[in-house]
C-alpha cells in the first residue's frame, strides 16, 4: 500500500451541504399525499406487492447502518452525519408506503414466500458484525469509498423500481414523485462522495469493485424471500424497458472512476432475470 492509496479524501472540496440536509430533513408525508384516486380503483396485485417490498427495503436501514458502523465508516464525520438524516428520511418513506397500502385497503405484509436466496457470491455479505469488523480492519479507511458507492448504486436500483411502479399504476405517480424528490438529495450526496473518493485512491477503486460484485441488489434484499427477489427482478427489469433501465444503470456504474465495464456487466447480469 502506498501513501496515495491510503488517502481518504480527494482534492476537490465537497459541495453537498450536510448541515443543510439535516436542517431540512423531510419527515411524515401523509399530509402531503392526495390519495383520493386510490379509492376509485383497487391497486393491481403486482403494484401492491412491489410497494410492500419497497417499504421493507426502506425499513432495512438500521441493519445496514449496523453493518457500516462497525467499519472505518463510523469514523468519517461527514458520512455518518449524512447517514443519520438518510435513515430518518427513509423511515418516513416507508411510512408513506404504509399509508398507500392502508388507503387502498391492502394488507401491510406480504405472505411468507419462503427462504432467502443463498448465493455463493453474496456469502461475504452474510457475515455478522464481529467478522465484518475484523475484515474491515484490514481494508482500512478506503472502505468508505466502497460503502458510499454501493449506496449510490442501490439508490439507482431502487429508484428504477419506483419509476416502474409509477408507469404501471397512474394513481401512484404523486407518491412516486414525492419519494424520488426525497431520494434526489441522497443520490446527490452519494454521487459526489463516490466520485471524490474513487478519484483519490486506486485502492478505494479495488475495494469498491469487490464490493459491487458481491453485493445483493437491492442491498436490503439479502434476507428477503427468494420469491420476492425474483418478483422484483422480473417486474422491474424483466421487460424490454426494464432491461434498458438495467443497462443504463450498468453504464453509470461502469463510468465511475476506476470501476469499468466488467463490473457494470456483472451488475446488469444480477439485475436482469
Where are these regions (language model features)?
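Non-heme di-metal
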Residues: 2-273
Amino acid at each position: 500500500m502506498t501513501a496515495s492509496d491510503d488517502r481518504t479524501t480527494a482534492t476537490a472540496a465537497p459541495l453537498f451541504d450536510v448541515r443543510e440536509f439535516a436542517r431540512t430533513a423531510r419527515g411524515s408525508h401523509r399530509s402531503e399525499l392526495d390519495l383520493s384516486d386510490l379509492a376509485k380503483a383497487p391497486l393491481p396485485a403486482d403494484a401492491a406487492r412491489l410497494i410492500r417490498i419497497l417499504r421493507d427495503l426502506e425499513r432495512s436501514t438500521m441493519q445496514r447502518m449496523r453493518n457500516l458502523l462497525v467499519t472505518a465508516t463510523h469514523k468519517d464525520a461527514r458520512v455518518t452525519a449524512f447517514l443519520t438524516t438518510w435513515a430518518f428520511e427513509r423511515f418516513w418513506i416507508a411510512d408513506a408506503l404504509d399509508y398507500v397500502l392502508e388507503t387502498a385497503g391492502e394488507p401491510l405484509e406480504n405472505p411468507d414466500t419462503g427462504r432467502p436466496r443463498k448465493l455463493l457470491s453474496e456469502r461475504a455479505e452474510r457475515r455478522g458484525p464481529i467478522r465484518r469488523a475484523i475484515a474491515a480492519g484490514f481494508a482500512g479507511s478506503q472502505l468508505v469509498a466502497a460503502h458510499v458507492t454501493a449506496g449510490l448504486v442501490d439508490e439507482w436500483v431502487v429508484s428504477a423500481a419506483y419509476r416502474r411502479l409509477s408507469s404501471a399504476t397512474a394513481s401512484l405517480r404523486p407518491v412516486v414523485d414525492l419519494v424520488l424528490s426525497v431520494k434526489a438529495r441522497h443520490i446527490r450526496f452519494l454521487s459526489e462522495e463516490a466520485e471524490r473518493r474513487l478519484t483519490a485512491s486506486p485502492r478505494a477503486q479495488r475495494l469498491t469493485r469487490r464490493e459491487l460484485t458481491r453485493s445483493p441488489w437491492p442491498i436490503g434484499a439479502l434476507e428477503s424471500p427468494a420469491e420476492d427477489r425474483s418478483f422484483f427482478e422480473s417486474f422491474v427489469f424483466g421487460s424490454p424497458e426494464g432491461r434498458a433501465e438495467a443497462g443504463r444503470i450498468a453504464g453509470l456504474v461502469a463510468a465511475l472512476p476506476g470501476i469499468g465495464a466488467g463490473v457494470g456487466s456483472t451488475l446488469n447480469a444480477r439485475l436482469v432475470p
